[in-house]
Design a protein with these regions (language model features):
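An acidic/histidine-cluster motif and surrounding catalytic segment
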Residues: 1-114, 119-131
């Protein structure tokens, strides 16, 4: 079972079902089944995203999505309770809105795409990977 922890400010009307669907679609696409896993998804504003990028990426830009994996030096960390804690996906709501408008898609479609992208990073996929 995959436990999806969602954190969002009430100012950001993100559809939680879409966030959950995005996570589950990536797991299905990657044929990840019969696993106890946990992932968190947070929806934040520009100020919080800028603080995160300043601290962790040292660029201070507003990214649409960031991923913060929880892994040991040799890959995913084994926990005493056998729950695979993958990490956190963080979406910047104002950037989601801008991307949706730019790409002429709905906010839900953009949330689905960006959340899925973030989850793929947590699973070890990176830009340019073909597998």
């Amino acid at each position: 079972m995959v436990k999806i922890l969602i954190s969002t400010d009430p100012r950001y009307p993100v559809n939680r079902k879409v966030l959950r669907r995005a996570v589950m679609e990536v797991f299905e696409k990657e044929k990840i089944t019969d696993i106890d896993a946990e992932i968190s998804v947070a929806v934040v504003g520009r100020r919080k995203m800028k603080a995160l990028t300043s601290k962790y990426l040292k660029d201070g830009r507003n990214h649409e999505v960031l991923s913060f994996p929880v892994e040991g030096t040799g890959g995913f960390a084994r926990t005493p309770d056998d729950i695979l804690r993958l990490g956190d996906v963080v979406l910047c709501w104002p950037e989601v809105l801008l991307c949706a408008a730019r790409d002429n898609v709905t906010c839900d479609e953009e949330v689905l795409k960006l959340t899925g992208h973030g989850v793929e990073h947590l699973l070890g996929k990176h830009h340019g990977d073909t597998n």
